[in-house]
Amino acid sequence: MASSDIQVKELEKRASGQAFELILSPRSKESVPEFPLSPPKKKDLSLEEIQKKLEAAEERRKSHEAEVLKQLAEKREHEKEVLQKAIEENNNFSKMAEEKLTHKMEANKENREAQMAAKLERLREKDKHVEEVRKNKESKDPADETEAD
């Protein structure tokens, strides 16, 4: 477009800015449009060409379907692997927890048995001491009675 095709008309002038209107002159009939108004005519397709296009489309559909099925199979395989790993980790955790609990129970049992053995030993020592005191008392008592008379 040439600059003669455009007219600028000032509307307002303010401190905040300027308002104006652009007036475009109508196109001259001599100028050629830059793009065609209608799409180019398509050539008539033969039966063979139509058949080839249909076969190519069918091949693309089959290829796409095969790709989708492959992706689904890979996804299922991944899900199986994840599930198997989770089950294995759960089993390992259960096994470790059971071993830990068993070890703790054995330690408690040994501790309890050691405490019981210590109590029995103290009771035996006490009984032995009581028996010694009784013997000492019996051996002293007859002597004390004769001396008192």
Swiss-Prot record:
Q: Which UniProt keywords apply?
A: Acetylation, Coiled coil, Cytoplasm, Cytoskeleton, Developmental protein, Differentiation, Methylation, Microtubule, Neurogenesis, Phosphoprotein
Task: Give the record's GO biological process terms.
Answer: axonogenesis; establishment of skin barrier; hepatocyte growth factor receptor signaling pathway; intracellular signal transduction; microtubule depolymerization; mitotic cytokinesis; mitotic spindle organization; negative regulation of microtubule polymerization
Which residue intervals define the domain SLD in the entry? Answer: 4-145
Question: Listed GO molecular functions?
Answer: tubulin binding
Biased composition range(s): Basic and acidic residues: 104-143
Q: Which Gene3D superfamilies match?
A: 6.10.280.30
Spell out the subunit comment. Binds to two alpha/beta-tubulin heterodimers. Interacts with KIST.
- The gene it comes from is Stmn1
Its function, per the record, reads: Involved in the regulation of the microtubule (MT) filament system by destabilizing microtubules. Prevents assembly and promotes disassembly of microtubules. Its phosphorylation at Ser-16 may be required for axon formation during neurogenesis. Involved in the control of the learned and innate fear.
Query: Which sequence positions carry the modification called N6-methyllysine?
Result: K29
User: Which residues are modified to N-acetylalanine?
Assistant: A2
| Example of a GO cellular component annotation carried by this entry | membrane
Q: Which Pfam families match?
A: Stathmin (PF00836)
- Source domain of life is Eukaryota
Q: What is the lineage of its organism?
A: Eukaryota, Metazoa, Chordata, Craniata, Vertebrata
Source organism of this protein record: Rattus norvegicus
Where in or outside the cell it occurs: the entry states: Cytoplasm, Cytoskeleton
Q: How is it modified after translation?
A: Many different phosphorylated forms are observed depending on specific combinations among the sites which can be phosphorylated. MAPK is responsible for the phosphorylation of stathmin in response to NGF. Phosphorylation at Ser-16 is higher in the developing axons from hippocampal neurons and seems to be required for neuron polarization.
This one is known as: Stathmin
List every position bearing N6-acetyllysine: K9, K100, K119
Coiled-coil ranges (or none)? 41-140
